[in-house]
Amino acid sequence: MKKQNPWISLSEEEKNQIFNFSENYKKFISKFKTEREVASYALDKAKKKGFLNAEEKKNLMPGDKIFYTCREKTVAFAIIGKNPIENGMNLIVSHTDSPRLDAKPSPISEENELVFLKTNYYGGIKKYQWLSTPLSIRGVIFLKNGEKVEINIGDNENDPVFIIPDILPHLDRKIQRNKKSDEIIEGENLKILIGSLPIETKEKNKVKLATLQLIKEKYKIEEEDFVSSEIEIVPAGTAKDVGFDKALIGAYGQDDKICVYTSLESIFDLEEIPNKTAICFLVDKEEIGSTGSTGLDSRYLEYFVSDMIFKIKKSEYNNLHVQKALWNSKSISADVCAAINPLFSSVHDEQNAPKLGYGIPIMKYTGHGGKSMASDADAELVSYIRQLLNKNNIAWQVATLGKVEEGGGGTVAKFLAGYGIRTIDMGPAVISMHSPMEITSKFDLYNAYLAYKAFYKE
């Protein structure tokens, strides 16, 4: 199924529209790098667009714009549709978390008069890619009195950055050079250099004490306070255009913030009341299996759908309404997929692999080997999506995750399908996924926005 490169047929006006849309996305992904930051941004923008806190409303009716928030990391936005909600909803679900490093509960140590922050990697990273890379420290810490302190260090002009120092090639022959890629550095050694100046004292660990003193002076944070913290270490720096033609975007966290951004913008831009209730659901913890109380496996979806239906049905409410609403719904698992990387093309079945710049990929299934752990969308749903995209002149392509026995992976699709929701994976293709600098196409970004908006409208 060969297709011409879609860029060729675009007018200058269409190209400008795509490039202009991409500029705001670049600003977004440069600034908001953690799940808390993304959730906060989404809530702030939703309020400006007229969305109200559903927990404070007693009744809901068609056209109402509402939001739900779960522990400052997971958020849902809904526009109540014209049709009875038990006839089904249209959901787009993306995730706010990205692979990163997390600080350990007792993280600060001194070794050879240098101070390090000990970490535990989060999600599927290639550990060696994080060596000698400028890093930013972000997150929240609760002090012993319960006060919340937010930190964001490494991305402002006058901020320091932080580094995991690599070994020089002159001395790496025995310790590193002949090892497998996942053994180049042990997870326990992903320690971030954060200080080197000592303090004048008779105590040991003079540099650690000096670093802790600086942290306390600026942020009121003491060493024990790290126990009640969520400190995330992410790549420093901003999104960049890639290539002379500037048609690609390089940035950290595009898995899955490219889908977060496009699903948000598309629901915010709906001009008319949709036929079916439209839901934009941004969830946490996808990169580690959707676990925890803010992950999709927590049943928060069932909670807020039940609350919506109760406020619509009032005295007529019963649990069967909830089950019917979920069972009759359609969902897009809005997550990125792996584009063909010409340097490593052998891992793909090229006939079934997406390319950068060919539109939004439709991925019927993910999983491993024999489709293990996949939700595997039914042909009827794929047909519906295909017709929807064609009807709206939206560029699309097919996608699978590599050759059959090459590897594999999963998304939130199986958790949505567990409610009986008909679900398909559909998100832009990415090169260098899970790296500190992921690459996407501006054309695919814009067509994801168009596709999600068309889906909400139905």
UniProtKB/Swiss-Prot annotation:
Specify whether Zinc is a keyword of the entry: yes
Keywords of the record: Aminopeptidase, Hydrolase, Metal-binding, Metalloprotease, Protease, Zinc
Q: Which cofactors is this protein said to need?
A: Zn(2+)
What residue ranges carry the coiled-coil annotation?
none
Enzyme Commission number = 3.4.11.-
Q: Drop me one GO molecular function for this one.
A: zinc ion binding
Which Gene3D superfamilies does this UniProt record tie to the protein? Aminopeptidase i, Domain 2, Zn peptidases
Q: What class of enzyme is it?
A: hydrolase
User: Could you state one GO cellular component term attached to this entry?
Assistant: cytoplasm
Q: Which residues bind Zn(2+)?
A: 95, 170, 434
Matches recorded under SUPFAM superfamilies: Aminopeptidase/glucanase lid domain, Zn-dependent exopeptidases
What GO terms describe the biological role, i.e. biological process, of this protein?
Answer: proteolysis
Any Pfam family: Peptidase_M18
Question: Which InterPro entries does the protein's record reference?
Answer: M18_aminopeptidase_1, Peptidase_M18, Peptidase_M18_dom2
Q: Which family does it belong to?
A: Belongs to the peptidase M18 family.
What is the designated name of this protein? Probable M18 family aminopeptidase 1
